[in-house]
């Protein structure tokens, strides 16, 4: 399997060829959302970071139900703007603190190469 690096320019290309088990094996969190923020996929690394089971979060809204601390202009605003413009590609640092110990992370948002979905990649800093 090809090594996927957090923040790599073509990460959306690599993700398109990966199955669920390979996505779970990533060394960083990977959350796939639809345009409204509904969670389509949530890998094991993200579950370990947040203490949430992937099975419990799929189908819920990321910004409203799972991580309301991200429903800010800095995070959710970037997501909505990128979706509206069709060119989501942002990388920034953030602190997750909803129902967990405050944790500084690096976030990389990218539009998926196929379909109408979007990836949020998360790595502890």
UniProtKB/Swiss-Prot annotation:
Record domain PAS: where: 23-86
Swiss-Prot/TrEMBL keywords: Chromophore, Photoreceptor protein, Receptor, Sensory transduction
GO biological process, one term: regulation of DNA-templated transcription
Processing after translation: The 4-hydroxycinnamic acid (p-coumaric acid) chromophore is covalently bound via a thioester linkage.
Modified residues (S-(4-hydroxycinnamyl)cysteine): 69
InterPro entries in alphabetical order: PAS, PAS-like_dom_sf, PAS_fold, PYP
Coiled coil feature spans: none
Gene Ontology MF terms in the entry: photoreceptor activity
Keyword RNA-binding: no
Known role: This photoactive protein is a photoreceptor with kinetics similar to that of rhodopsin.
Similarity comment: Belongs to the photoactive yellow protein family.
Identification of the protein by name: Photoactive yellow protein
Organism listed in the record: Rhodothalassium salexigens
Organism ancestry: Bacteria, Pseudomonadati, Pseudomonadota, Alphaproteobacteria, Rhodothalassiales
